[in-house]
Amino acid sequence: MVKRSQRVGKKAVEVNRGTWTAEEDEKLMNYVSAHGDKKWRMLPAKAGLKRCGKSCRLRWLNYLRPGIKRGNISEDEEDLIIRLHNLLGNRWSIIAGRIPGRTDNEIKNHWNTHLSKRSLTIDDLNNKQNPGLDNRDMLSPTKITQRSTPTHTNKNTNDELIDSWTDLPAPDFDLEQFLSLLPMSDLCPGSNGNDLELNDFGIPINDINQDSFRSDDYNVNYQEFLDSQVWSRAFEFDDIDQFLDCQAYGSLCSPIAGQ
């Protein structure tokens, strides 16, 4: 420990310089707790310390004062220091006032030792906290539009008729009513490839009398069609008696309905 003489009034007093001891820290804390942190110039002599007033003040503010944090500065505190330094510059006392538990001397030393070597800006800190907003991860406006715009399939009238009529069970299928809803061009000979055909609805063409479709009346021999549907569905029944019972009532029964 280096000793140095200092004149206090008319007397020369030896002053210790260097590392503080635990005994000196205890004396300083006891005196400040009892008398407050005022009049630092007269404090060393009253507290029994061979230190100058400035050394006592810095020791108290930077190390012994209640509420001082110990340990390394966290990453969040570093980010806050960088943001405040970009706004305030080297005004360490003001910066320390906005970071609880850290002193201006500690923040200044940490900045000069570690943070000043980094070329981080506020934009870099924002990208660091929100990696999803990085330009490399952002979608282009075209991709966003493609994802947000639903794909709609335009169906013509014929497709809608297929969807609504082919799902009906056989007893509810009214062929005459269905054919009356179709455009006339769909039943006329020489129709183009985009028009409907009867086999699109599960109706076998070979089972229907084609002579029944004429351009003058468009009548359909649907009784023959229903008879053919009845015998073709006979194989769906596990019990032939069940099938014959359905025929006795003159209706098309499904295996599920008969059970």
From Swiss-Prot:
| Domain HTH myb-type, residue spans | 12-64, 65-119
Q: Where is this region: Disordered?
A: 129-158
SMART domains per UniProt: SANT (SM00717)
Coiled-coil ranges per UniProt: none
What SUPFAM superfamilies has UniProt attached to this entry?
Homeodomain-like
Q: Which molecular-function annotation in GO is an example for this chain? A: DNA binding
Cellular localisation: Nucleus
Here the segments flagged for biased composition (Polar residues) are: 142-156
Under the heading Gene3D superfamilies, the entry gives:
Homeodomain-like
Key word Lyase present: no
Q: Which domain of life is it from?
A: Eukaryota
Fetch the InterPro entries from UniProt. Answer: Homeodomain-like_sf, Myb_dom, Myb_TF_plants, SANT/Myb
What UniProt keywords are attached to this protein's entry?
A: Activator, DNA-binding, Nucleus, Repeat, Transcription, Transcription regulation
Q: Does Cytoplasm show up as a keyword for this record?
A: no
Cross-referenced PROSITE patterns: HTH_MYB
User: What cellular component terms from Gene Ontology apply here?
Assistant: nucleus
UniProt DNA-binding region: 40-64, 92-115
Q: Its biological function?
A: Transcription activator involved in the spatiotemporal regulation of flavonoid biosynthesis specifically in the corms of Montbretia. Activates the promoters of enzymes involved in the biosynthesis of the flavonol myricetin and the flavonol-glycoside montbretin A (MbA). MbA is a potent inhibitor of human pancreatic alpha-amylase and is being developed as drug candidate to treat type-2 diabetes.
List the protein's name.
Transcription factor MYB3
Gene this chain is encoded by: MYB3
